[in-house]
Structure formats: C-alpha cells, structure tokens
C-alpha cells in the first residue's frame, strides 16, 4: 500500500480528519444568525467522513447539504453514517476537487468548510468560491492561524514548510475583505478540539493501523509523522490554532 492509501486507511476510521467540535460548529451557526427553519442550499467543502455535514443536517432539518470531498472512501463512511442517523435525505455526497466545484453561480446560501481550505490555500479558496454564493450568502471556514505575532523557531519552520500561507487572523480577515466579503465573526478553536476531538482518537488508532498494515516501514513513518505533529502542538499550542471565519458575500 502506498503512502497515500495508508493515510486514507488511517484517517477514514476517524470521526474527524482535523481539529473541530460539534459545539464549535453550532457556535458558528449561532454567530451567523442562521435561520434553522429555512430551506437553505448548503455545500460542505472538504467534508471528510462527515462530522460537520451530519451535524448540520441534524440542526438544519429543512436544508439540503452537498457534501464534497475528493476521496470516495470518506464519502462512503459519510453515507453510511447519514443512513444510520436518518438524515440521508438531506445530504448529497459529491466526489470532486474543491478547486473544480460544479455549482452554478449564486446557487448556494451557505458555503461551509472546516479544516480543509488549506488544500488549495485560503486566498485561492475564498476568492474562487465566492461566485457560488448568493449575494449576502454565508461563508464559514476554519483555517490554521497564528495566535501570536512572534513564534518559536521550531514551530515557524515546521509550518513554513507545511503551509506557507499560515498567518494571523487579522491578515486572513483582510483577505476576505479583498475578495468581496464582509467579515461578520471570528473565534479560535479551543484546545479540546485538537486533543479530545482529533489527536487522542487518532493516537488510539495507531496500533490497529500498524497491525493492519503489517507494521511496514511506510506505516511506521506515517505514525511517526503524525506523532511529531501532535508533540509540536502540545509544546506550542499557545501560538497556533484553527480560527473560524464567518463572512457574507457582498452584493
């Protein structure tokens, strides 16, 4: 199994593929003053196995959500969970790239994306996705964000290599303004969204993942890389988190 397939194998068994939390997803809805009784057309971009999609479907019973992910394996999990949770009629799974979305212009009331926009870059994402939103439509994205203006060298070097577009919230808000949005809210994901919701469940899967893949060198390298990221977060969590950005498309 190649590294890409191994990563899918490790992460498709997780409820989340990145930091987040149900309370934080609902907080974003509340801050945006979303009418829960309205029939909204929503896209959840980079949905993974569906943590946010499934919650949105429960909280917004009159709405329809198109759950977009590049990986059919993740969408298979989402579809099974949607059936189990009796919300399958509110969700359509779509396997495609987030930089080649098939939506018509001004088709969406809400465009949601938790922990995924980094795959194409924050600026490219918010600029390219804007046309899919109706005037006044809601954008909610979470993005890896510096919490301090000065960071330890080890942390800075790691993220410069992983995601050079990482920046302070003030810079991200300016990007939203530059590309035709009115920012309406922002908050930082708390520590439990990293540890309890993502890293601890991920660590709990390491042993089974290694056994399932014959304790191969490739599998061990993936586990080691994941553990290095966890260690880095725990050491420097005062300097970094995901920020949740809320904005409305200008007319």
Locate each region found by the language model:
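Short, glycine-/aromatic-enriched active-site segment of Class I SAM-dependent methyltransferases
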Residues: 144-163
